[in-house]
């Protein structure tokens, strides 16, 4: 629901302002169909299931870093039932929040991100590119590595807070990778912090939305330091 064409346009404007261009535009939404088909593959291999619990119930069962989580009561649904329910989600026959699709990994993993993460949810929202073609949307971790693989990216560079995600990134790739193609690798680095300024997108958005500062545009000035 946070997707908006203005953010896409702002990125393009910033790249142009820096004096660069690009050969090809790529969007994760271009891969929605492939991601959906891979999700059906996971279900068919009994590696994903439709969970009908509320988000609060799912969170309560996740456990803690020191305590294992608990299996969902829907974890052992049959492949046939999961396939039917997931197709109903895609066809818009399910209200938001009623079902989610989760990967079936390990609820006792010391890495809490591996405890049956949600990979699809229902959302009745118009997407800036796909419009209303899709009512199910893939979660970040499912989209990340798979998009890198589709684009044949060799290395995905992330800041250090994504280090715990690497195990999940690799698990998802294990399910779809072809040995004849490039297998992406996630690598992390320390984020650059600048003194006496703010670079956090969340904090900058707060400042702009509350009229504490103005949104800079290339029409306003040519020097961002001015």
Residue ranges and their predicted role:
Residues 15, 42, 173, 207-208:
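Hydrophobic alpha-helix position signal
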Residues 216-226:
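Single conserved hydrophobic/aromatic residue that forms the stacking wall/gate
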Residues 7-14, 38-41, 168:
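Alpha-helical scaffold elements adjacent to nucleotide-binding pockets in ATP/GTP-utilizing enzyme cores
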Residues 4:
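A charged helix-plus-loop insertion that forms the helical arch/lid used to bind
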Residues 1, 9, 27, 44-186, ...:
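Active-site cores that bind ATP or allylic diphosphates and position pyrophosphate for catalysis
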Residues 12-27:
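A glycine-rich helix N-cap at a beta->alpha junction
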């Amino acid at each position: 629901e946070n997707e908006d064409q203005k953010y896409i346009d702002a990125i393009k404007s910033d790249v142009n302002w820096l004096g660069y261009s690009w050969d090809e535009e790529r969007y994760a939404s271009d891969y929605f169909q492939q991601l959906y088909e891979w999700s059906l593959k996971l279900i068919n291999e009994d590696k994903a299931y439709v969970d009908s619990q509320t988000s609060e119930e799912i969170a309560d069962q996740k456990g803690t870093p020191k305590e294992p989580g608990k299996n969902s009561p829907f974890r052992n649904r049959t492949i046939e039932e999961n396939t039917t329910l997931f197709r109903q989600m895609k066809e818009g026959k399910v209200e938001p929040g009623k079902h989610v699709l989760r990967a079936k990994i390990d609820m006792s993993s010391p890495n809490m991100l591996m405890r049956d993460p949600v990979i699809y949810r229902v959302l009745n929202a118009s997407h800036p590119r796909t419009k209303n073609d899709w009512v199910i949307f893939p979660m970040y971790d499912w989209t990340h590595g798979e998009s890198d693989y589709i684009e044949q990216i060799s290395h995905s560079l992330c800041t250090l807070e994504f280090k715990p995600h690497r195990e999940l990134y690799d698990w998802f790739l294990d399910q779809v990778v072809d040995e004849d193609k490039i297998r992406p690798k996630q690598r992390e680095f320390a984020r650059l912090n600048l003194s006496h300024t703010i670079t956090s997108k969340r904090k900058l958005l707060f400042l702009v939305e509350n009229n504490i500062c103005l949104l800079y545009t290339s029409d306003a000035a040519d020097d961002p330091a001015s």
